[in-house]
Amino acid sequence: MKNHGIKANSIKTLNLETILKAYSNGIFPMAETKFEDDVFWIEPKFRGIIPLDAFRVSKSLKRHIQKRKPIIKFNQNFETIVKGCSNRKETWINSTLYNTYSLLNKAGYAQSVEVYENNKLTGGLFGININGAFFGESMYSISPNASKIALNFLIERLSKCHYTLFDTQFISKHLISLGAIEITQESYLKLLDKAINKKVDYAFY
């Protein structure tokens, strides 16, 4: 993991002003493992984004949504979503970041998108929003396709509310299959500047 030269040692939360300033400047926090309290600031040379007009919805996912008719909610079980995302053998979400995301959620900057089927939470995602930018942090599924359903709904909502940037931080084969692309940090910062200075309709209601 490449860090930005700053290391926060054994603290329970990151300062709200500091974390928002970091995201607004193209920098984000990660931990090496969930067992360590230290947090590193990351500024990759290449960034992953999903252009909001390029998200790909497979026919099978459309059929799944039509058949199962999942219910989508925002921020009803934010901490459960973060815990679900961190409940893996290897994860970068440690206790410091968990506390930070909870703080951001209470302040209105961190959002969860939750998928319910038969009144049960089956997965979702969470991220940070600053004006016209949404920074996707992590997602997980208990039942098949739950995270894809959450992502599909979120991107539709962001598009309707005139957001211009969906940041995935890095890319993976899974994200590429959904429409993610990789751009340089220089190009990313130009998109970021426009997005965080853009007035948009609030998406998370």
Predicted feature locations:
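N-acyltransferase acceptor-side catalytic subdomain
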Residues: 1-205
